[in-house]
Each structure stands twice: as C-alpha cells, then as structure tokens.
Amino acid sequence: MSNFLLVIPEDVIKGCSKADKLVVTGEFDNWRHSDYVLQYDGSTQNYRVQIPRRKGQRSTMFKVVINDKKWVTLNYFDTVTDKSGYTNNILHFKDNEASQLMDIPLSPHTRSNTAKGKPEDDSLNDYVNLSSHSDLSSTEEIVCWNSDMEDENMDATIQCDFHQAFNSRKESLNGLMCIAKKVKTYWNK
C-alpha cells in the first residue's frame, strides 16, 4: 500500500472557513471520516492530505465531510453513483501517476534532406498544434443554444478559471507532459 497526495484548491471548497474541520473519507477508510483531515497550505492556497492507495488500484470514491455533519461532493472532481445510489467523487490515480511521466527534452531537430534533396533550415520555427477530437474538446467554443436559459439552471455546471487556478501548479503540467509523451512516441514509430 502506498500513499497519494490529494490536493484541493481553496476556492473549490466554498462556504468554509479555515476553522472548519474538513475530512476526506471514502473507500480507502471504509467511510469512517476520522483519519484524513485536510490541512490548509497558505503558500499554495490548497488543502492537502495523504490518502492510502492499494497497489494496482486505479480509482477510489470519496467525499468531503464538513464539521462531522455535512457530506459534500465537489464539482472539481468527477462524480459516480455507487451501488446504494449515493453520488460520490471519484479520484483516478492512473491519470496522476508520476511514474508515467518522463522528462522530454525539447530541442530543435533538423533533418538532413527533404524528399527533393534540399536541406530544411526553417524547421526551427515549426510547431505542433495539439487538440482533442472528442465531442467536447477543450479547444472548442461551447455555444449555449438556448440564450433564455436562467442562471439557476446552471448550478451544476463546473466553472473554473484555468488561467488563475492552475498556472502555478505542477499538476497542470502533468497532463501536458502525458500528451507530449504520446506525441513523441507517435513520431518515433
């Protein structure tokens, strides 16, 4: 069994003060909500706690308990409904494994000859545009088809300011590094 550092940004847990007791509970502690108290880190404005992870475990369900009374799920994480019908957050360990990430040196690579036998000197300014081809790509603009939709219907919508919340965090680069690793593997075939 190993430990996993769970980090939750301060602005994700709304309506709580630093005096409130915030406990993470889930499958890993049999929903006892006593051992895994979130600690606030003022320098990064995050709450942190180490949670256990069994070897080979790819995900775990969890919730946050506020002051031993209020059980909440957070829009920041994916949700799943368990066998009893309860909605819980789910944490995918595989997406966050540091062992899958590697340092990829980014340096210009010039080719010796093109198909016509001419050297390519302008490859130094080349770039690769990485985008998703899924139904809701992060690079696509989502247009609301019903402009009469009221704000109260949007309560369950996840809203994040990616420019503020994630720019200084190491975790924000992990996804980019995974994509870069896949691109590098593709090019080396």
Swiss-Prot record:
It is found in: Cytoplasm, Cytosol; Cytoplasmic vesicle, Autophagosome. The modification Phosphoserine is found at S107, S172. Disulfide bonds: none annotated. GO terms for cellular component: autophagosome; cytoplasmic vesicle; cytosol. Keywords: Carbohydrate metabolism, Cytoplasm, Cytoplasmic vesicle, Glycogen metabolism, Phosphoprotein. Present with 1540 molecules/cell in log phase SD medium. This is Autophagy receptor ATG45.
